[in-house]
């Protein structure tokens, strides 16, 4: 019998590849969080497709209160930033965009809930899609945060559970290459902040996705509006 695992699955590129790395060796249950984000309809649709592809159980946890206390452009009617291609490598511009889409303590909330569920079903690991490129602007994607949260688990759980972030040292380009290597269903992943039926192509998440496939020289089957 395979050991159990939990994955925090948004349906995006990163979480899809991270999950796929462990798919053959673990009995995985995927959790998708609904915190009122604009893209939730598409996230749920694509996360379900990914779970069917990888033969995983899928549960959805609603967090309406997180939307109520958040001022993020992801959960309000504020405009989502549309950075230029050059802005993606401009630290100050990237920080500005990150602050606009930042949902305070989101990963802390997600990991705490995932930990609770993992302990209840005796899962050994929690899989997350945190990566190097996003850690530059999002502190809760960093190695330091990962180490600190795993240290917290040691003191806050009866079980030996560990958060695994296999992409923590990877850029988006590296992630696409890894996804291609492990046959991750990247073609059915969804990255857009806006939540259109097709990727908008102009939000930061879409632009980083497009650039990653191009740089990795891997065919991108994503449909973009622009």
UniProtKB/Swiss-Prot annotation:
Chain sites annotated for binding ATP: 9-19
UniProt KW keywords: ATP-binding, Ligase, Metal-binding, Nucleotide-binding, Zinc
UniProt EC number: 6.3.4.20
Cofactor detail note: Binds 1 zinc ion per subunit.
Domain of life: Archaea
Catalytic activity as recorded in UniProt: 7-carboxy-7-deazaguanine + NH4(+) + ATP = 7-cyano-7-deazaguanine + ADP + phosphate + H2O + H(+)
Pathway(s) it belongs to: Purine metabolism; 7-cyano-7-deazaguanine biosynthesis
Residue positions binding Zn(2+): 192, 200, 203, 206
Enzyme class of the recorded protein, top EC level: ligase
Keyword Nucleotide-binding: yes
Record keyword Cell membrane present: no
A GO molecular-function descriptor: ATP binding
Cofactor: Zn(2+)
InterPro entries reported in the protein's UniProt record: QueC, Rossmann-like_a/b/a_fold
Family that this chain belongs to: Belongs to the QueC family.
Function as written in the Swiss-Prot or TrEMBL entry: Catalyzes the ATP-dependent conversion of 7-carboxy-7-deazaguanine (CDG) to 7-cyano-7-deazaguanine (preQ(0)).
Protein name per UniProt: 7-cyano-7-deazaguanine synthase
Natural source organism: Methanosphaera stadtmanae (strain ATCC 43021 / DSM 3091 / JCM 11832 / MCB-3)
Gene coding for it: queC
């Amino acid at each position: 019998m395979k050991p159990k695992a939990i994955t925090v699955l948004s349906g995006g590129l990163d979480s899809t590849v991270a999950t796929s790395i462990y798919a053959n060796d673990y009995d995985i249950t995927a959790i998708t969080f609904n915190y009122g984000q604009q893209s939730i309809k598409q996230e749920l649709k694509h996360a379900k497709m990914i779970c069917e592809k990888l033969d995983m159980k899928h549960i959805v946890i609603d967090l309406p209160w997180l939307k109520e206390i958040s001022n993020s452009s992801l959960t309000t009617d504020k405009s989502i930033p549309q950075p230029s291609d050059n802005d993606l490598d401009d630290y100050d511009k990237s920080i500005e965009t990150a602050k606009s889409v930042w949902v305070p303590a989101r990963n802390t909330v997600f990991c705490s809930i995932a930990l609770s569920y993992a302990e209840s079903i005796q899962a050994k690991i929690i899989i997350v899609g945190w990566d190097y490129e996003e850690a530059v602007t999002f502190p809760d994607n960093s190695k330091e945060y990962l180490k600190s949260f795993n240290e917290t688990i040691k003191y806050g759980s009866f079980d030996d559970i560990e958060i695994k972030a296999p992409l923590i040292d990877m850029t988006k380009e590296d992630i696409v290459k890894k996804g291609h290597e492990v046959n991750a269903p990247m073609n059915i992943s969804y990255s857009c902040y806006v939540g259109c039926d097709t990727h908008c192509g102009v939000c930061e998440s879409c632009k980083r996705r497009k650039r990653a496939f191009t740089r990795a020289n891997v065919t991108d089957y994503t449909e973009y509006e622009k």
